[in-house]
Amino acid sequence: MKKRFPTLLATLIWTALYSQHTLADLAEQCMLGVPTYDQPLVTGDPNQLPVRINADKTEANYPDNALFTGNVIVQQGNSTLTANQVELTQVQKPGEAIPVRTVTATGDVNYDDPQIKLKGPKGWSNLNTKDTDMDKGKYQMVGRQGRGDADLMKLRGQNRYTILENGTFTSCLPGDNSWSVVGSEVIHDREEQVAEIWNARFKIGKVPVFYSPYMQLPVGDKRRSGFLIPNAKYTSNNGLEFMLPYYWNIAPNFDATITPHYMERRGLQWQNEFRYLLAPGSGTMALDWLPSDRLYHGTDGTEKDPTRWLYYWGHSGVMDKVWRFNVNYTRVSDPDYFTDLTSQYGSTTDGYATQIFSVGYADQNWDATLASKQFQVFTTGGNNNAYRAQPQLDMNYYKNDIGPFDLHIYGQAAKFTSVNPENPEAERFHIEPSINLPLANGWGSLNTEAKLLATHYQQDIPNGFASNYKNQNGQDATVPNLKDSVNRVIPQFKVDGKVVFDRPMDWSEGFTQTLEPRVQYLYVPYRNQDDIYIYDTTLMQSDYSGLFRDRTYSGLDRIASANQVSTGLTSRIYDDELVERFNVSVGQIYYFSRSRTGNSETIDNSDDTGSLVWAGDTFWRINDQLGLKGGAQYDTRLGSLTLGNAVMEYRKDAERMIQLNYRYASPEYIQAAVPNVKSPGYQQGISQIGTTASWPIADRWALVGAYYYDTKANQPASQLVGVQYNTCCWAINLGYERKITGWNNQNETSKYDNKVSFNIELRGLSSDHSLGTAQMLGSGILPYQSAF
């Protein structure tokens, strides 16, 4: 395994050099085979425009008809008809001021306008309405991909509709018949950008592979009901997969996509997505339903319910400028769902699914939010310790300019329940008034704040709590000495000052450098909180910005004492267009006394004082393509470097990118952050080095790769390689992914999942001519994220 990393890196370096000479822009290549209309556009009523005819020979019976032979060219406005012979007929109907003029053309007939080109042996056209017929002809769209042939072609509705009888349609360029759709009748609506096909037969080459009595295909980017581009692929887990999305444009503010997703080894899954736009906001609802998964046996190998599903609802909106509605709800049938099945609404790396509903009201100086919060945890046993806040009410009141002071009052009421009946439950009431004195000018600020944190807990402690706690945390674990009723009152005082200095840089004209020192003093007296259970609290990261937070923990269950000074220094460099090119920040927390919440937390066991916590962040955008960033946090209370990351990325454009990164989390930090979750797979810490890259390797070929190696476990964490070949009307993708999906308790090793995928995509029906690298990189367990 260790030899694969340099081999992949060498390959990427070679392709980076080679592709500079071989890559041509795919969009430009595709448009080379598409006809364009390069004549000046004529405006005005087509019926009022004159008809110009040139021919080698003319015979006329004025005013009824005329016969033109030899190199005939008929022009009216933006329409041109050429043929060997053309007969012009003019009929004056009673009561109509404009006569009906028609032409019948024979012999090498060609018709073109700004939207379409037609070619055939015989044609007819009404010069008044632009209705045109062509026998046994061929057509090609102007300015976009799309062509075909038919026994009879018709143009109707001022060239809006192209109607084909026994016709074909393909987005492939002339000379390439890789795929096509054949129908007894095909209607192409240029305004709605859709093709309707009756008795549709989908062909690959000359071989029919799919039949439908009726089909709609989009031929543009406009919203329109109809079948979207089908997709087929092969994976080692699911076998052959085929997806045929149907888009339903229900109304201007409603639409839906229904996708039957056939998986050879699992069965038929229905993927349904509904989008809406209403006065309270916009949102998306999704339901994925696999009624009988033939492969699912669960993580322990036992039989599980084969019905697998996912429900998602995302909503965000504001109504009447004061009401706010938000929903972020995801629920799946089982904890293995994202491991086995691909979804845009979650992944195995998330670890949990969020289920939050909230409605808020905001006025000029106060706001209130009522929410329901719940989490579906996927780790083994993790869901037994998960808590839900149902309901949770948060309120804020602001009153500024009370003399030189600003007043803020925050309040919360929450009820916590657990899915495990042996866990404590609680009602929590919290009020937090604060008053601050803000002072600021153009180069600095000083903010002095005093607040009072008052919290009441009413806890319901079950009789079996002690034994349940020991079963989960070990028989030698110390059971928290919880109380039914707890009152906690803690004052807080803080002074925060910062200054910004700037100067022109001597060595680079137009560049500006800033120096931004910051000092904060924080005092919070100690209160023992071991009699309060943990409901929504976890240890937060101490990155540079975190050095100046009031709290060490999220939530309200733990408020750490503090008698400390945080100091930091930031320097930034801006170019002549005020784009930030470089910054570096370094800071520390100096503790005058021990910071603690009681005796139960790991981080409370340290008696050290002084400079205990250090953090630094840096960012360097060397140029528009190359950048570096990183950060590190050191906490002597946990005995080591706790968190670290570093990223270097070169991005030339959307298709060419190389990223190197490293991420680290100490086992002590993980234990302190998630003490109730026991998983040997990551309790030893995280130390991963990896690379992610995408690069065109030759004309129309793109390669992506990702490799992450865990230096703690001495094993690969994730491997991904994919290659895609793109043409103007189809693309083919071959990929391999190997990822960790769990932990085997029997032999104490990581469980891996290996997946080989083979994917075919139809192209040319929209304006997307990308090489597909973004989709391939986003499919991995550790999806690519841009560094800058």
UniProtKB/Swiss-Prot annotation:
Subcellular location: Cell outer membrane
Superkingdom field: Bacteria
Keywords: Cell outer membrane, Membrane, Signal
GO CC list: cell outer membrane; transporter complex
Record flagged with keyword Membrane: yes
The keyword Lyase is annotated on this UniProt entry: no
Signal peptide: 1-24
GO biological process: Gram-negative-bacterium-type cell outer membrane assembly; lipopolysaccharide transport
Predominant location: membrane
InterPro entries reported for this sequence: LipoPS_assembly_LptD (IPR020889), LptD (IPR050218), LptD_C (IPR007543), OstA-like_N (IPR005653)
NCBIfam families per record: PRK03761.1
Assembly: Component of the lipopolysaccharide transport and assembly complex. Interacts with LptE and LptA.
Family to which the UniProt record says this protein belongs: Belongs to the LptD family.
Function description: Together with LptE, is involved in the assembly of lipopolysaccharide (LPS) at the surface of the outer membrane.
Protein name: LPS-assembly protein LptD
Organism: Yersinia enterocolitica serotype O:8 / biotype 1B (strain NCTC 13174 / 8081)
Recorded name of the encoding gene: lptD
